[in-house]
Amino acid sequence: MTKIIGRKRELQQLEEAYKAEESLFVVVYGRRRVGKTFLVREAFDDKLAFYATGVNQENKDVQLMYFYHALCKYSDAPLALPKSWLEAFDALIKILEASKEQKKVVFLDELSWMNGVDGSFLTALEWFWNSWASARTDILLVCCSSATSWIINKVFNNHGGLYGRVNRRIHLHPFTLRECEEFYENRKIAMNHYDQVMSYMVFGGVPYYLSMLESTKSLAQNIDELLFHPDGQLHREYENLYQAMFRNADNHLLIVKAMAAKNKGLTRNEILEATGLPNAGSATRVLDELEQSDFIRRYTSFGQKKRDEMYQLTDAYTLFYFHFLQDGKNNDKQFWQHHLGTPKINSWAGYAFEQVCLAHVEQIKMAMGISGMAVSTSGWFSKGKEQKAQIDLVLDRADHIVNLCEIKFSTRPYTIDKQYAETLQNRQWIFEQETKTRKSCQQVMLTTYGLAKNQYSSIIQRELTMEDLFH
């Protein structure tokens, strides 16, 4: 059995479901490439009583054909090709009734692809669970889908026979930096923390992407080989990623492109204006689907109301694509090695590092010793017309402290000069004036290598480095 990196909570949930004294219906969901199938197959290893997967963009007859071949694999008796999903699940019931396994694990992968356009698969699944499986004590039904929105809308929020039937929901997110480090160690990939952070800025914590890194090459060489070479495995990933995850993905792509042009994010109205989409529920649905799939985040500026909330693109690969690969504008197969340290890469790195930090807020709170405290997390940007100011991360603490966190990427210890010290102090003053907070404000600086000590560094009450993100 291959070692599973991280995923301790998810593995425990699956183990508890397996040991349960009643039949359970478990759904594992999350963005494409995050390791859902691998997790379930490795967790149950040789315990699977049945496994079948859907096929992307194929019709009902083709889906039934693949399901039939899966049935034949697990059946001791010859089977006829089912003419409907109801017949297919009836055949599955007979296979499970003949199984001698104490707990019969049924794993159905890429559920949304199986369902296709006519939806008859879901109706048959309802019948299978409600009329047979749920009445027993020996069935563990595990379903997966990369189409997070489909799972939520069609299964979790089902208004028919599946309403309230899912017993466990496991949302699989990308790896944290600590889990990535464990992954590299397991793969014998030598990489210091700076390169691991840089890798996260490019690939996120997506296991499938990380599995392509070759231990014999440097990170820069791997980036060039995977992303900039015309035949690189991830050179055309953007073209496939959204189409595979979302049915009718054109509006998703419109919104993502609009967000990529505005680092701090956009309000819903700004998104509609930038994309030309109608002010209707369909736009809200697309935004929800992108958020539920870990491509964007929604946040409210400190002190602002929900109607002022912002949507921000956070998916590392997508951000990288729009900076360097969009429209095939880059023909240099060794672009990364040729441009390391240049303004083009440095300007991207500042924002990409900020997103890495925002993905590790729990680790930041732990490093600051406030993980057990009630803390509200937000960003902040000034509404003033004359003096513009923005704060990357605001931690509003129950002990009447507000941490104003500045995030800076640097290849060496970061130096605060007189001008920047004045900027930080002025920004705090504007924050206090506009928000009218009665709490004490403290400046926090999170950098790659810490601060260079000088006469101005003392204005920072708390200093964090990239090492604190690896907790």
Annotate each PLM feature.
Residues 1-339, 343, 443:
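Phosphate-binding site recognition
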Residues 302, 309-471:
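A cross-kingdom feature that marks ATP-driven nucleic-acid transaction machinery
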